[in-house]
Amino acid sequence: MQSIKYHLRQTKINMNRTDRIERITAITDKTTDWKQQIPWKGELKSMPVYDIPLDLLVYNKYNGRILSRTKSLENQKQKIDVESDSGKKIIEKLLWDSKEERNKKTQISIANFGQQKVGIITKDGIIIDGNRRAMLLNDIQNDGFLSKKKLPKKYNYFKAVVLPVTLEENPIEIEELETKFQMGEDEKLGYNATEKYLKAKEIYLRLTKSSKIILNELNDEAIKKISDWMGETNSEVRKYMNTMVLMDEYLNYLEYDGIYTQLDSREDQFLSLTKWLNTFYGSESKKGFDGYDDTDVDDLKTIAFDFLRIRNSYDGKEFRNLAEGNKEKHFFGNKEIWNNFSTKHFETLDRIPEESEIDFNTNNLEKHLNARDNEFFETSKFGKSESEFIENINNNKTLVGYNRASDAPEKLVKKASQAFDAIKTGHSSFSKPTVQNLIEELGTKVISSLKDKSTSKVLDHIINLLESIDIDKIPDAEVEKVKLISKKITSYCYHNFDKGL
């Protein structure tokens, strides 16, 4: 049962709406010579433009420019009441922060010359197009609370076309109009990258009256409408749907469901991953290693999600190493490299301590989650200067490079020699058993490659090694062992070379 407080609040909202409708109607009853053409009910209509007092305007909290922000707040159970002063301040702050530098320039222009682009509102004052301009006008009247700059207060009204309906009376028609104005080709340039995906999802769910997007059952009619409204092709809108579903899955993976702010700065990586999964799932693509299956693609997605999470801690172009391009260019194209890379990744993941619980009640969830993601990255360093996730990328990038240059052994051998020359053999860590074992393993590989091509070169190399030994410097603890080995060498040479040749 709803509270008395709720009913009182609704009564006040209805009274405010009624008052706004009456006052706006009094304005629109007057004649005006200024007209603006807008698409309405399937045709381009010439509608009058009026000067609407700022106090009659109500922000649209689902404006495409800040949709990811308002949805994120609401998914934190934070109610945004656009009729209240507190709700109004939240929307204004989100609008200001969405493009601060651009807002500063536009606000100066508006203060000096007035609003140059006409907005659109409903008959009860809900802003359909022009949230940002209205916010800038309000901020000027509020002595630059957001901009921290006092500007001339010459314009205390909003130039707008007034639609003959409320939002509730014709939601689909208004959605179409709003989308065409907000997400047209010119406007999209000023929007956060995530907004267009989220906007397409919201429209699709509203048109189809669905609770979620099912990719293999997309409604063609809804896709066509969205493509018309957004000025995109059908295939582009389908790509939006695919990408948005993956974005939601990523947020679910991190338990950040509905917190769309955590998608910022990751659009390129999501587009790449969406393309990879469409390529690899369900069939064996020539771009993947031979014999991979869907469980390998599952691993690719999980690993990609981890690298999406730490996206702000490395150059985003490195993400391409996972699976971008032809098979010889990436990790997923070579079975040995992929197994090496994925095994190391999951080993690193297992070593990271369990993370603390997410504090969904924090005042700034975006900051809290960013700090949490950064801690995840820092922990992966395990006291070293570089994250093991990044080390793993770099190490396997080298292997991919070696594979691609396998037809040029001279270059690879030179690189290997230069790499070995760079090692500080006098450093104490060089004597560690693990390092010495690796050196021995490397030496065995070198000798093995020589013996297949030239036995005499191997023997010459052995003689050079024997001649380089300073007998006087052999440690006492090794003398007896050296004697045994030297006898073994003599015996081996006698029985295998003197008698055999």
Where are these regions (language model features)?
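An acidic, glycine-rich, mixed-charge low-complexity segment common to nucleic-acid enzymes
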Residues: 1-38, 44, 237, 433, ...
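Short, charged/polar connector segments at secondary-structure boundaries
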Residues: 3-150
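Amphipathic, charge-rich alpha-helical segments that serve as recognition/docking helices
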Residues: 94, 152-244
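Glycine/serine-rich loop-strand microenvironments at binding/catalytic pocket rims
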Residues: 101-124, 293-297, 307-335
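Amphipathic alpha-helical "recognition" segments
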Residues: 145-158, 197, 206, 231-326, ...
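C-terminal structural cap/anchor segments
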Residues: 336-426
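Charge-dense, extended regions
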Residues: 391-501
